[in-house]
A protein has these predicted regions:
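Low-complexity, highly charged intrinsically disordered N-terminal segments
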Residues: 30-35, 41-52, 60-63, 68, ...
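Conserved SAM/AdoMet-binding glycine-rich loop
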Residues: 33, 37, 281-386, 390-429
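Short secondary-structure boundary/capping segments
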Residues: 47, 111, 146-148, 167-168, ...
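Canonical Radical SAM [4Fe-4S] cluster-binding loop centered on the CxxxCxxC motif
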Residues: 44, 241-276, 567-576
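Radical SAM enzyme core and accessory elements
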Residues: 1-20, 32, 464-576
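N-terminal [4Fe-4S]-dependent radical SAM core
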Residues: 2-31, 38-39, 193, 203-248, ...
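Glycine-rich beta-alpha loop elements in corrinoid/cobalamin-binding modules
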Residues: 67-212, 439-491, 498-509
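Flexible glycine/acidic-rich beta-alpha junction loops that bind and position SAM and/or redox cofactors
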Residues: 71, 197-201, 304, 333-334, ...
Length: 576
C-alpha cells in the first residue's frame, strides 16, 4: 500500500493510543522525522519522548514522519506526516531523531524525496531549517556535517527547551547564516558545522578544527543531572512496533560498569536512576493503556527499586519485560516476578567467551556468574535463554572465539540439567555481533577486524554449535558492521561517500569502487593516541587521559571498578 494513501495513515492512527492532536494556529511547525520505517521508529522510546516534549511547548506543533515502508524505492513516494498528511517540506523545521549510524543514508533519501536540496549550503529561505539530534550525534556528527544545518548535542530534556525558547518566526525569517549564528551563540549544545573549518594533514588525518565565527570552540553536551522530575515513557502505544502494545518506560540513564566497548556507558555519564515515585506515575499511566510494560535502561539490574517496581506491576496484573539483565544480578525475587509475568525468554550478555576477554572489555562478570545465571533462569521456570556475544574485540585470538563455543556448551549442559528437573527443554539463542569501535570509548583508537576475518570467526562459532541440540546461532552481517564503523568514526570527507551512495541508490559496492575517499581509512586504521579525532570538539566531560588509561589497561587485561557517583571523579564527568 502506498505511503501517501489516506487509508494507510488512517489505519496507523486508528491503531494508536495517545496520539497528540494540536492545531497549527500560527505555531512553529516541526516535522519530527525518524530515518527508518514507522515500525522501527515507533519502537524507539527516545523518538516518542521527543515528540511528546516538543508538543508541550505552547508555540510549537510537532508531527511525526518516517521513511516509506518500501524504503523510498518508489519514485512516486512523498514524505508526509502521520498527523496531517502534510509534506515535511511545508514545515518550519525538519528535526531528525537518529540513534543508529546505518540510518544516515535514509536521511538523505528522505530529504531527496521531500524535494529539498541535500546540501546545507544549498538551502535557505523558504526551505525548512534542518536540525538533527540523538545519541548518534552525541558521538560523532561529522559524516553528516554537509547536510544538516545544525545539530543538537545533548539530552532532549536539557537542550530542547532552550532551543525552542530561542526559535521564533522572526528568527526563521532571517537569512540562514544569521539564523544559525544566533542559535549557535545563544543555545548551549547547538553545533552548526558551517561555522567551523577543518584542515587535514597530507596523510588524511585531521590537523585542525576551528570556529570561523564568534561561536564556542567546543560544544558542551547538555544532560539532565537529576531524573527525578523528568519521566520518559511511551506517549503512544500501538501494536505496529517491535514491542507490540508495550508501554516503555526509561528507568535509568547511563551505566556504572564501564564496559570498554559500550558508548552508552560513557556518553551518558554519570549513571542516573529514577526514583520509585516517578516510575510509579509512569506505571499508572502505562497500565491504563496496556498490560505490557517494558523497562528500558542500560543498567536495569542496578536500579535500587527494581524489586519494588516489579512487585507493583505484578499486583496490577501487568506483564513486565527487560532488554537484558546482568548475570551477577539475578536475584530469586526478580526471577520469581519474571516468571509471574509469563516471561518466556531471559537475556544475558556475556559479550565474550573467556574470562580473559571479559577482563579486556571490563565486563565484570565471570564464567561462574554466567553459568549460575543460566541455572537460576531455568530453575525459576523461564524456559528460554538468549545470549549476546561479540567477535572481533581488541586482542581477541581464535582461542577466544573457540571459548564462545565452549561456554555455550557449558551453559547448555547446565540448562539441560535444570530443564530435566522441570521436564521441559527450552531453547538457547546465541546472538553474535561484530565489534565496531565507537567514539568516546577506550576502544575509539583501535582498528576493526577485516570483514573476511569476522566472517571466518562467525563461521567458527556456527560450526562449533551446529550439532548442539536446542541451540540456535544468529549472526550479523559483517559488511554492514563495516559500514557502521565507517559512519561511526568518519570525518567530514566521509560525507562524500554518503552523497555518492545516495546517487547510487544504496549500492555500497559500486560506491566504494568509485569513491575518491577510501573507506578503509576510517575502518581498518589504528589511530595514534595523540591524533586529533573528528569528534574531539564535543565535550562530554570525560577526560581523554582517562580513556587512554582505560585503553592501556584493556591491552594489559586489567579491570576497573564501577562508577561510584557520590565519591568518584576519575573520568572527569563528576568534578563539579
Amino acid at each position: 500500500m502506498a505511503w501517501t494513501t489516506h487509508k494507510f495513515r488512517k489505519n496507523i492512527m486508528d491503531s494508536e493510543t495517545g496520539v497528540i492532536r494540536k492545531k497549527w494556529n500560527g505555531r512553529i511547525k516541526v516535522a519530527l522525522v525518524y530515518p527508518s520505517t514507522y515500525h522501527i521508529g515507533m519502537s524507539n522510546l527516545g523518538f516518542q519522548a521527543v515528540y511528546e516534549l516538543i508538543n508541550t511547548f505552547e508555540n510549537v506543533v510537532c508531527e511525526r514522519s518516517f521513511l516509506p515502508e518500501n524504503g523510498g524505492s518508489d519514485a512516486a513516494d512523498r514524505i508526509t506526516t502521520i498527523e496531517s498528511g502534510s509534506s515535511i517540506s511545508s514545515f518550519d523545521l525538519i528535526a531528525f531523531s537518529v540513534s543508529y549510524e546505518n540510518d544516515y543514508p535514509n536521511l538523505l533519501t528522505i530529504l531527496e524525496k521531500a524535494k529539498l536540496p541535500l546540501g546545507s549550503k544549498d538551502r535557505g529561505i523558504p526551505h525548512p531549517l534542518v536540525i538533527a539530534g540523538g545519541v548518534a550525534f552525541f558521538l560523532n556528527p561529522e559524516p553528516l556535517a554537509s547536510f544538516i544545518d545544525c545539530f543538537l548535542i545533548g539530552e532532549a530534556e536539557a537542550i530542547l527547551p532552550r532551543f525552542f525558547d530561542a526559535v521564533s518566526h522572526d528568527l526563521l525569517s532571517q537569512d540562514r547564516i544569521s539564523c544559525l549564528k544566533t542559535l549557535a551563540r545563544e543555545v548551549p549544545g547547538v553545533y552548526v558545522p558551517s561555522l567551523y573549518r577543518t584542515e587535514y594533514n597530507s596523510d588524511g588525518t585531521l590537523n585542525a578544527f576551528e570556529p570561523i565565527a564568534d561561536v564556542p570552540h567546543k560544544i558542551e553536551r547538555l544532560y539532565v543531572k537529576d531524573l527525578s522530575f523528568t519521566p520518559t515513557c511511551s506517549s503512544i502505544v500501538t501494536p505496529n512496533t517491535i514491542f507490540d502494545n508495550t508501554f516503555l518506560m526509561e528507568v535509568s540513564r547511563g551505566c556504572p560498569h564501564g564496559c570498554r566497548f559500550c558508548a552508552a556507558g560513557f556518553v551518558y555519564r554519570p549513571p542516573r536512576f529514577r526514583p520509585f515515585s516517578i516510575l510509579k506515575e509512569c506505571m499508572e499511566q502505562g497500565t491504563s493503556k496496556t498490560d505490557k510494560i517494558g523497562l528500558v535502561g542500560a543498567a536495569v539490574s542496578d536500579l535500587p527499586d527494581l524489586n519494588k517496581i516489579c512487585g507493583w506491576e505484578f499486583e496490577k496484573d501487568a506483564r513486565i519485560s527487560f532488554s537484558s539483565l546482568r548475570a551477577d544480578a539475578l536475584t530469586s525475587e526478580l526471577l520469581s516476578i519474571l516468571k509471574k509475568s509469563k516471561t518466556k525468554t531471559a537475556t544475558i550478555a556475556p559479550d565474550a567467551g573467556s574470562d580473559r576477554m571479559r577482563n579486556v572489555i571490563n565486563k565484570g562478570i565471570s564464567e561462574t556468574d554466567i553459568l549460575d545465571a543460566a541455572e537460576k533462569i531455568v530453575a525459576a521456570g523461564i524456559p528460554n535463554l538468549k545470549l549476546y556475544f561479540m567477535v572481533g574485540l581488541p586482542t581477541e585470538t581464535l582461542d577466544d572465539v573457540e571459548a564462545i563455543v565452549t561456554l555455550c556448551k557449558k551453559i547448555k549442559h547446565r540448562f539441560l540439567k535444570s530443564s530435566r528437573a522441570k521436564k521441559r527443554m527450552g531453547e538457547i539463542t546465541v546472538s553474535l555481533n561484530s565489534f565496531v569501535p565507537k567514539p568516546f570509548t577506550p576502544f575509539q583508537w583501535v582498528q576493526m577486524d577485516d570483514v573476511r576475518l569476522l566472517k571466518s570467526k562467525i563461521k567458527k562459532v556456527k560450526n562449533g554449535l551446529k550439532r548442539v541440540a536446542n541451540v540456535r546461532v544468529h549472526a550479523d552481517i559483517p559488511k554492514w558492521a563495516y559500514i557502521h564503523a565507517l559512519l561511526s568514526r568518519g570525518d567530514r570527507k566521509a560525507g562524500q561517500i554518503l552523497s555518492l551512495v545516495n546517487t547510487n541508490q544504496g549500492n555500497w559496492p559500486r560506491t566504494f569502487k568509485s569513491s575518491p575517499v577510501n573507506p578503509d581509512f576510517y575502518v581498518y586504521r589504528e589511530r595514534s593516541l595523540d591524533e586529533l579525532l573528528p569528534w574531539d570538539f564535543i565535550d562530554h566531560g570525560i577526560r581523554k587521559s582517562f580513556l587512554k588509561s582505560e585503553y592501556k589497561k584493556a591491552i594489559q587485561g586489567k579491570t576497573s571498578p564501577p562508577c561510584v557517583v557520590e565519591s568518584c571523579n576519575i573520568c572527569g564527568v563528576c568534578t563539579e
